[in-house]
Amino acid sequence: MQSCITVIGERDVVLGFRLLGITNTIVAEGKDLVKKFMEEFENPHCSVIVVSEHLKNMIDKKTLRSIEVSSKPLVVFIPLPGFKEEESIETMAKRILGIDIGSV
């Protein structure tokens, strides 16, 4: 069974990951962003989804909670350049995985 890393978001977000060699990328905004994200979230072959932080404001709290506690696929929200990051990687790892990587 092959797993994948998917990047979904605005053009600026996706372009950076394409330059790093990630080929499974989807440019989407607004309602299309939510639709494309949910399709990938339900894909059993998808291991990691990197998505624009704007998605958090577009989905209901119940769905957001299930996304935040999911480990397969692991969802990583990234801010757009110029926007404040809400949660550090260390905090997210501790919340999702129960591991404090800040003291490593």
UniProtKB/Swiss-Prot annotation:
One of its GO terms (molecular function) is proton-transporting ATPase activity, rotational mechanism. Disulfide bonds: none annotated. It comes from the Archaea. It is a peripheral membrane protein. InterPro entries: ATPase_V1-cplx_f_g_su, ATPase_V1-cplx_fsu_bac/arc, ATPase_V1_fsu_sf. The keyword Membrane applies. GO terms for biological process: proton motive force-driven plasma membrane ATP synthesis. GO terms for cellular component: plasma membrane. It is found in: Cell membrane. Keywords: ATP synthesis, Cell membrane, Hydrogen ion transport, Ion transport, Membrane, Transport. Belongs to the V-ATPase F subunit family. Component of the A-type ATP synthase that produces ATP from ADP in the presence of a proton gradient across the membrane. HAMAP family: ATP_synth_F_arch (MF_00312). Has multiple subunits with at least A(3), B(3), C, D, E, F, H, I and proteolipid K(x). This is A-type ATP synthase subunit F.
